[in-house]
A protein has these predicted regions:
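Class I S-adenosyl-L-methionine
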Residues: 3, 72-73, 89-204
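Conserved alpha-helix/loop element of class I SAM-dependent methyltransferases that forms part
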Residues: 1-13
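Conserved class I S-adenosyl-L-methionine
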Residues: 14-23
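Conserved SAM-binding motif I beta-strand of class I
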Residues: 37-42
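Gly/Ala-rich phosphate-binding loop of Rossmann-like dinucleotide-binding domains
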Residues: 32-33
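S-adenosyl-L-methionine
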Residues: 49-75
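Conserved SAM/SAH-binding beta-strand->alpha-helix loop
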Residues: 44-46
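Glycine-rich SAM-binding Motif I of class I
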Residues: 25, 29
């Protein structure tokens, strides 16, 4: 639930949201309580059917459901796109196949955040801000992208840009340093050594 609340905090009351891979549409239900309209989309029909069950009258008013394997037709760039709970390459595939160029995208990918940042820039999306979320002892990286061009350092592409929770960022980085050092005790990997050096010398 921490992830949903964090995503919601980056969405203003006047936005409309498209949640691709909506699962149980919990984000849409959370937004509905604030009077925010959303489209809950998923590739699996049974997920949509289950998500529609036991909706309150308020939720029915603010949530539209659609079956789609990516960005559904009928949306435009003014809608805020949420891509959460999926891998980096799935996120990139969805965007590469989309006919819409969004003004704002919120992601929580499961892996390869450095690749996500670099590839999103190639697609014309730029990192606005980030936040580390800790949920059930796991760390998640929320990234907000927009279309305002910015330049980023090698360090920022690896660790992130404009982090909002430096305490959790430091905690996550220390976890990664310990994890990578255990690997380096068994094998000498130059790329991993460079990553550890960047993490160790990062200025919070």
């Amino acid at each position: 639930m921490n992830r949903l609340k964090c995503i919601s905090s980056y969405i203003s009351d006047n936005e409309k949201v498209l949640d691709v891979g909506c699962d149980q549409a919990l984000l849409s239900k959370l937004l509905a309580r604030r009077g925010v309209y959303s489209i809950a989309s998923d590739i699996k029909a049974n997920i949509i059917i289950n998500a529609k069950k036991n909706l309150s009258d308020l939720e029915k008013k603010y949530i539209t459901f659609t079956l789609s394997d990516g960005v559904p037709e009928g949306v435009d760039q003014t809608i805020t796109l949420v891509l959460s709970g999926m891998g980096t390459y799935t996120i990139l595939d969805i965007l590469k196949n989309s006919k819409v160029f969004f003004n704002k995208i919120i992601t929580i990918s499961n892996n390869n955040h450095d690749i996500l940042r670099s590839e999103m820039i190639k697609l014309g999306y730029y990192i606005k801000e980030e936040e580390i979320i800790k949920d059930k002892s796991k760390y998640y990286n929320l990234i907000v992208f927009d279309r305002i061009k910015r330049e980023y350092s090698k360090e920022e592409l690896l660790i992130g840009y404009n982090h909002k929770n430096k305490v959790l960022l430091k905690e996550k980085n220390e976890y990664l340093i310990n994890k990578y050092n255990k690997i380096l005790n068994k094998t000498n990997n130059e790329k991993l050594i460079n990553i550890v050096n960047i993490l160790v010398n990062y200025k919070y």
